Amino acid sequence: ELVFGAMMSGFNEKCYDGLSFFNTAHKVGDATYSNRSNKKLSRESYMEGRSSIMSIKGDKGKSLKLVPDLLVVPPALEETARLILEADQIDGTTNVLKGTAKLHVEPALAEHPEYWFLLCTNRFLKPFIYQLRKKIKFTSLTRDTDENVFMLDEYLYGADGRSNAGYGFWQMAYGSTGEVEAQAQG
């Protein structure tokens, strides 16, 4: 839940370079890169995001050799995403994008039904970081000798834990707000 919250907030929240995590002006050396779009999910916008991640170079001008492997969508985009990633053919032509990433449909993204994210998760470093500071511990007050049970006939249950999520490497993520139609290549 924390990671998906960070993902959705990435269009506004800043990462280590002082820019929003998803931004059109990330600097690496003399080059400027974008990992942000406003295009609706389509074959064309998916290819654009894939190309964006795969084209990023490090500060010495060499490819980071990143290949995105996970498409994250809200339930409203599941059908479109499945067509892009799983269909043998689309509109009578071979789907060359089949199998280029795994699909994760995330209910927590339902509040933003047009957002979609393409991530590179196959490396040790990740685009988002989940930090478990204190493992969740479940407790209960259910014994007959507990005051709440004896006096009020109430059984209490609780959980205590600490964790957080934040931004890792923007180079490994591409996000879109899905506001405008992508132009078909022709």
Task: Please place each PLM-identified region on the residue numbering.
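Long, contiguous amphipathic alpha-helices that act as assembly "spine/axial" helices in icosahedral shell
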Residues: 1-15, 71, 157-159
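Compositionally biased, low-structure terminal segments
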Residues: 5, 12, 22-23, 118, ...
